[in-house]
């Protein structure tokens, strides 16, 4: 059925980990979706990042660009962007913390990740509940400027510390 999702991989964090990697991207489909929820760092005020994986290893080359709009319930909207980065920012720039009820949730769509001859790109929709109770959201995208390698997955990590217990990351094929 067109528009269906097939679960490929899921990681449920049962003890704090430095990173989570989802694998299973192959040449079967061109579009994949990642859903994450209840993502919280074990160190206060951290930003969540992502990197594509090549042969199961997160790519750390400075060939990633991203831009998005930050929508804040308690302040003016903001824009953020970066070129030639070694990672793509996922969560709100002010960071997610360890206070009760703070968490990040979101959806990414991945395009051309399985194509070795094309740039890979993603779209992002993410929401955060901050320690102040402010709801924030991000909407934007990023590009992985590598047209010589196919990607087989995607990894997530915080700028510092670990991803805490209870986070769920799921990779789907979009069919």
Indicate where each model-derived feature is located:
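Surface-exposed molecular-recognition determinants
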Residues: 2-175
């Amino acid at each position: 059925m067109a528009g269906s999702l097939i679960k490929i991989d899921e990681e449920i964090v049962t003890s704090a980990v430095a990173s989570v990697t989802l694998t299973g991207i192959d040449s079967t489909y061109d579009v994949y979706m990642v859903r994450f929820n209840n993502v919280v760092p074990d160190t206060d005020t951290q930003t969540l990042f992502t990197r594509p994986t090549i042969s199961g290893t997160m790519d750390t080359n400075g060939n990633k660009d991203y831009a998005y709009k930050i929508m804040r319930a308690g302040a003016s909207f903001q824009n953020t962007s970066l070129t030639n980065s070694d990672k793509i920012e996922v969560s709100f720039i002010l960071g997610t913390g360890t206070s009760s009820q703070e968490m990040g949730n979101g959806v990414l769509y991945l395009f051309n990740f399985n194509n070795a001859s094309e740039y890979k790109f993603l779209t992002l929709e993410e929401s955060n509940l901050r320690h102040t109770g402010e709801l924030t959201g991000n909407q934007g995208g990023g590009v992985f400027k590598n047209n010589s390698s196919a990607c087989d997955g995607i990894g997530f990590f915080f700028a510092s510390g670990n991803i805490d217990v209870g986070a769920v990351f799921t990779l789907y094929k979009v069919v």
